[in-house]
């Protein structure tokens, strides 16, 4: 009997006491959760930890009193499986269900609401019976914008609550699949943030940072979080390909957070990261380089414990980081971000040649010719031998003239159309003033009348 049928059958009335029956599915085999399948589901797949599940349910006390039903609200109930959002019995039972399945679940108090109950409808130490129908389940969306680009399904839960942070050393075993074809199978030990150098998609690294030690998960990646519009020749992955990875996070060692490092460590790590960023940049891995330079900024931006000698090094590192960030943003065509990075650099050194020039390039890229020209002119004022600035200034002026010419032509065409429309309107008005044949026959009388009127007015 389905949940809908049960609702019709009971017709709002209190049922007879419900019997305790079913297969014991409690982890301890203590008969705390008993399950009876009323209708088999389809397929072989069941929901995994972290999946969002959608169900209809009705709940009764053992005396047959109904205390709750999603059917009465005509709205499916959803929750994240295995996250403690519902009573223990539900997390246990729904994990065993297939889509379309209907089952009865009997839950002892320790797997339901315990000695506290849930006043006013559920008394203390109550054994409950539920009928649950599973409609669908889907993996956990790990993307910030919830665009479905990184979906995780947890096969095996990990230990504890700690997760790898940026820069953590992780040990993983992974398998990559494209259309069920195994294209990558490796055991790796690497630093989070350097996955691209190992031909790992950025989305996979993001997923690893959400895993716990010992966790085994399936990760589904949309193209923008995988190998994008380029694909990966090494693995024979075409452009715009969706991928699936099986990942086992064996172990990890978290990187020190900024607040855990002293000033000497921050300087030392900043120099190491700067060199790493330079290597990535030269290899054309601009996103990876970007991550390295951002680390330096986060470590040094608001640090106040440096000595006078250290502050000179800090100033130089911060300036270089903002300039390098600007260059990465330019390469990635993120022009607003490039301008922001240049502004940060120019706050540290208002006459910096690279800061002014790169900001001018960003302004030019978005057709903000006045601001671009001002930046290039200042570069030439301070550094007259800068040939690149002279070239870009000429380009800026040329494009300004082209834009003015286009605007002039646009306005000329606009005025020409307006003039034509005005002339057409006048012509139509004039044509409408001509008398008809009928009016012409009565013209003498009209003229006489007009003359009389003129005399009267005179």
Curated annotation (Swiss-Prot):
EC number: 5.2.1.8
Modified residues (N-acetylthreonine): 2
Keywords, comma-separated and alphabetical: Acetylation, Cell projection, Chaperone, Cytoplasm, Cytoskeleton, Isomerase, Isopeptide bond, Methylation, Microtubule, Mitochondrion, Nucleus, Phosphoprotein, Repeat, Rotamase, TPR repeat, Ubl conjugation
Annotated InterPro entries: FKBP4/5/8-like, PPIase_dom_sf, PPIase_FKBP_dom, TPR-like_helical_dom_sf, TPR_2, TPR_rpt
Phosphothreonine modifications at: 143, 436
Family matches, as Pfam families: FKBP_C, TPR_1, TPR_2
TM segment ranges: none
Region (Disordered): 423-458
Family annotation (SMART domains): TPR (SM00028)
An annotated Gene Ontology molecular function: tau protein binding
Cell cycle among keywords: no
Residues where N6-acetyllysine is found: 282
Cellular localisation: Cytoplasm, Cytosol; Mitochondrion; Nucleus; Cytoplasm, Cytoskeleton
TPR repeats: 270-303, 319-352, 353-386
Region (Interaction with tubulin): 267-400
Catalytic reactions on record: [protein]-peptidylproline (omega=180) = [protein]-peptidylproline (omega=0)
Domain notes: The PPIase activity is mainly due to the first PPIase FKBP-type domain (1-138 AA). The C-terminal region (AA 375-458) is required to prevent tubulin polymerization.
Name of the protein this chain belongs to: Peptidyl-prolyl cis-trans isomerase FKBP4
